[in-house]
Amino acid sequence: SKSSTETPPSYNQLNYNENLQRFFNSKPITAPVDVDPHEVEQSYDASTDARSFRSPLRHFEGSGGSGSSGNFNSGSNLHIGSITNTSNTGTGTSSGSVQLITLTESLLN
């Protein structure tokens, strides 16, 4: 039997396949297949993106365990602060090893 504390699925979870089908039936405008990934990569400003990505994590650093940040204790605050990723700051995908693909309905089936 299921636990009484289990959250029932939401409307969106129950209708995921229908929502996905409706999305593809609407024929959304997508990027052309001949887009050069290197051009897209060069226009990406990694330093701006890195700042916006790290800012929520900085909010938790050193916030203390007195309940000032909701239900976190000081151990979780230290853990959250320690996951800030600075190894790729400002580099984007410099190696070019990540291949961009266009999401199509056939890939999902």
Curated annotation (Swiss-Prot):
Top-rank taxon: Eukaryota
Main location: nucleus
Repeat as UniProt keyword: yes
GO BP annotation list: rhythmic process
Residue stretches of biased makeup (Low complexity): 69-97
Disordered, as annotated region: 29-100
Compartments (UniProt record): Nucleus; Cytoplasm, Perinuclear region
Keywords of the record: Biological rhythms, Cytoplasm, Nucleus, Phosphoprotein, Repeat
Entry PTM: Phosphorylated with a circadian rhythmicity, probably by the double-time protein (dbt). Phosphorylation could be implicated in the stability of per monomer and in the formation of heterodimer per-tim.
Disulfide-linked positions: none
Signal sequence coordinates: none
Entry GO CC: nucleus; perinuclear region of cytoplasm
Assembly with partners or alone: Forms a heterodimer with timeless (TIM); the complex then translocates into the nucleus.
Function: Essential for biological clock functions. Determines the period length of circadian and ultradian rhythms; an increase in PER dosage leads to shortened circadian rhythms and a decrease leads to lengthened circadian rhythms. Essential for the circadian rhythmicity of locomotor activity, eclosion behavior, and for the rhythmic component of the male courtship song that originates in the thoracic nervous system. The biological cycle depends on the rhythmic formation and nuclear localization of the TIM-PER complex. Light induces the degradation of TIM, which promotes elimination of PER.
Protein name: Period circadian protein
Natural source organism: Loxocera albiseta
Gene that this polypeptide is encoded by: per
